[in-house]
Amino acid sequence: MLRFGEVDAVSTTMKLHILSDLHTEFADFVPPETDAETIILAGDIGVGVEGVRWAARHYPARPVIYVPGNHEFYGHDIDMIAELKAAAPENLTVLSDDALVLDGVRFLGSTLWTDFKLHGEGEAWFARERARRCMNDFVRIRHGRQKFRPEDSVVLHEASRTWLVRQLEQVFDGPTVVVTHHLPASKSIAPRYANDPLNPAFASRLEDVIERYQPTLWIHGHTHEPCDYELFRTRVVCNPRGYPGEYGRGGFKPEFTVVV
């Protein structure tokens, strides 16, 4: 586990500036000035290393935590995490099933690919096949010499979930913030998408993990509808900009911050 800072974990408070799904591959974004100590980027900032480079330009001094989304991998191999980390300056940390302790706050970061079991094991095969036909993830991302497949997503999900549970089992004397790109609970699905057949490609059922370990805050992206709610004793938030045609309709707050 990486560690920065030597501040008393119990007395620490930290303001986080939270953004996701900026999709700078379609239109640039100039973030507002913020007094937040730490910047959280929950994926789909830009394609490949361009999102990391964007963050490095706009946040040259303060700590940045960057969790890759699905779009970071478009046109690239699913195993490009080393490239993202190599492109990051010293103040920016890419988390991909990685933990970071920063000034008394523990951050656990994972893309959290889905297992397609949102509606249960019996529906998972149908969910995978719909995603295979309809999701660009399984067209535009490579896995070695093949295309990335829903079955690969399941393997990655299981590895990430196992890693996350092991981290949460470790006692930590301070706030714990989980940052994922994909949705951790069905409650994060916006009401207008409640019956969307592709929801299992966006969200997984980690409600049991949240109930058992109750991290302080869970930040995610992927859906282009903001959310902010309590699940057990965990606050769950998402603050996505979305695609150019969605600007102004979803409730994105460029200045959104949370104190932990």
Q: Model segments located where?
A:
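Short acidic-hydrophobic surface loop/beta-edge motif
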Residues: 2, 96-103, 227-231, 256-258
